[in-house]
Amino acid sequence: MGASATNSVTHPAFTLNVRPDNIGIITIDVVGDKVNTLKAEFADQIATILQQAHALPKLQGLVIVSGKPDSFIAGADITMIAACRTAHDARVLAQKGQSILAQIAAFPVPVVAAIHGACLGGGLELALACHSRICSLDDKTVLGLPEVQLGLLPGSGGTQRLPRLVGVSKALDMILTGKQIRPRQALKMGLVDDVVPRDILLDVAIQRAKAGWLNRRALPWQERLLSGPLGKALLFRIVRKKTLAKTRGHYPAAERIIDVVRKGLDQGGPSGYEAEARAFGELAMSPQSAALRSLFFATTSLKKETGSAATARAIHRVGVLGGGLMGGGIANVTATRAGLPVRIKDINPQGINQALKYTWDALGKRVRSKRMRPTEQQRQMMLISGSTDYRGFERVDIVVEAVFEDLSLKQQMVADIERFGAAHTIFASNTSSLPISQIAALAQRPEQVIGLHYFSPVDKMPLVEVIPHEKTSEETIATTVALARKQGKTAIVVADRAGFYVNRILAPYINEAARCLLDGEPIESVDNALVDFGFPVGPMMLLDEVGIDVATKIMPILVEQLGPRFAAPPSFDVILKDGRKGRKNGRGFYLYSNPTKNSSPTKNGNSPAKRNSFKWRKNKVKPVDASIYTLLGVTPKAHLGAGVITQRCTMLMLNEAVRCLDESIIRNPRDGDIGAVFGIGFPPFLGGPFRYLDSLGADKVVQALRLLVQQYGERFEPCQRLVTMAEQQQQFYPVDANIDEVTDVAS
């Protein structure tokens, strides 16, 4: 790590140590924070420390490192934007960042970034301003510019430096997607100059600084071709077309990124930087960015909560009942993310093998991409074991049940765990439709029974619903939430009512889409209207993907407990009697050449929300199966209009979300927004149902619902909570609160 320093200047977040060999080490360590983030007040500190370094006559080079164990710089502190009241304020903020990083880029001796851990957003922009970048060959090291996911663009020079470093094509791909780049990939594309083991990272960076100025790496011929006039024009035309097709114009940051990158390439750096700062300022004030940032703060705050006032029990071992798709996924995230031993129980060895293969294949992908060593794959696989009986379950702290959606079977599972498990073992059911109170009805220890509703595919979807029943103990709630967090999940605690939260707000949306079809609207018109609105996939395509039989299974339960407004249109019975189950058997609303085995529901009983936005955007447009119109006695003709279709479907979802809040199904609007966005793909740029309701105004929503009542029936009757809010001109979120403050008052 080098000899002792001969000179030291200390600031709250930055320390400059100069070694006897005249290499300066700038260490970034934000006091009191687990990770480094760049804050507005650091600008002067960085400028001061650079001035101190510049004044050293014998200085040969600088190396910038992090004082955090597994984080370089996780990005800029986006609460800075909350302090900006105008686009001009945000523009000045960006210009300040540009100015500071320009000082690093213009420093008279080589500056090397030694990167270990997350190097994201403003962190990568700082690294790009350095003259060389060395990163650790470590799974914790990632590089990226994720600002687009917050409705922003990189505002401290990232849109200008990255294209010149790696080429415009690769740069646009990184900035437009916000994807994270792993070390080997970063080296291959020229984002970093070397990748080394973590324990020699600083030494290699010091040697690089001593080596003086190095020749700049030449871009690959493909990137050079795309930098020419013809190649550049073609590239930007294709990128813009694909971007608009994906965003449907709902994410202005993507289009501004394209404009700003093009500006810098065509007119030079000064024009590019000016355009970047201006675009950053305008985007920071956009409603889309406000909504996306609200989701960021909401999920961040939720991950800090325990779900209960009680203290969670320590979790040392986990059991899983059922080795199907859901059981295998749950075992996977428990072993690979939580790092906990998992014992799988299935009625036959094939189910256990299937669950083991799930994790083996997932880890195998990481090995093949050089993100994991084979020895680590073997180590993590050793955390998972299986049995056709309950041997080993006497030592587990919590059991997650993922078997058939059959009440008597689940009650038997509870009895088995109470017999073969420990006295403190928690029983968590992954049911999507059955009341937890009924599952616990025969339990000897009902206080240790709870619902834990995952969404498929488990290793991709961030959301879980934690469902306590009236006898569930506070300790059980806290422990279950703790497990979900260890698995990398965002957990919302919801009440034990039919459909819980996510499926309950999805059901009326699906039903109304089917009614639009019965009104004669073509299937593709219904789906396109909702995709244009911002959903990742249309409702009819969703039914095909989920399985029409699976999606409609919950409807009778909702009708029984919540009333006739949940009654499914008769078309579903007709479709099911015709043997149409969707993609899994090749017969649904759309035509399929080959049914996909992976799309079939498992014995774990996938729910409508279980198959969600992860793969939806990857689905190619398929032709509609026109025979379904004859089956339903419908002559398709587009006549409703996209606006009417969208209003009918979304207004029912919004109304039901407010009912869920009024009935305490969800604890606050924040949880409702997170559940809808991460559970069913509600348009993120709208912030979730409750933030969208605030943007529309309760009075306007009530007015729209009452008009729909006159046109289509009582199912559109606005709930009393919404009517009261309209009369009193109330909102779900405080009007005068900053976005980052909302999470503190959401309850």
UniProtKB/Swiss-Prot annotation:
Name of the protein described by the UniProt record: Fatty acid oxidation complex subunit alpha
Subunit record text: Heterotetramer of two alpha chains (FadJ) and two beta chains (FadI).
InterPro entries, sorted: 3-OHacyl-CoA_DH_CS, 3-OHacyl-CoA_DH_NAD-bd, 3HC_DH_C, 6-PGluconate_DH-like_C_sf, ClpP/crotonase-like_dom_sf, Enoyl-CoA_hydra/iso, FA_oxidation_alpha_subunit, FadJ
Primary location group: cytoplasm
PROSITE patterns membership: 3HCDH
Pathway given in the UniProt record: Lipid metabolism; fatty acid beta-oxidation
Pfam families per record: 3HCDH (PF00725), 3HCDH_N (PF02737), ECH_1 (PF00378)
Region span, 3-hydroxyacyl-CoA dehydrogenase: 313-741
Gene encoding the protein: fadJ
Biased composition (Polar residues): 593-610
Keywords (A to Z) from UniProt: Cytoplasm, Fatty acid metabolism, Isomerase, Lipid degradation, Lipid metabolism, Lyase, Multifunctional enzyme, NAD, Oxidoreductase
Organism encoding this protein: Yersinia pestis
Family assignment from sequence similarity: In the N-terminal section; belongs to the enoyl-CoA hydratase/isomerase family.
Molecular function as annotated in GO: 3-hydroxybutyryl-CoA epimerase activity; enoyl-CoA hydratase activity; long-chain-3-hydroxyacyl-CoA dehydrogenase activity; NAD+ binding
Function summary: Catalyzes the formation of a hydroxyacyl-CoA by addition of water on enoyl-CoA. Also exhibits 3-hydroxyacyl-CoA epimerase and 3-hydroxyacyl-CoA dehydrogenase activities.
GO biological process: fatty acid beta-oxidation
CDD domains: crotonase-like
The keyword Isomerase is assigned to this record: yes
UniProt-listed SUPFAM superfamilies: 6-phosphogluconate dehydrogenase C-terminal domain-like, ClpP/crotonase, NAD(P)-binding Rossmann-fold domains
Enzyme Commission number(s): 4.2.1.17, 5.1.2.3, 1.1.1.35
GO cellular component: cytoplasm
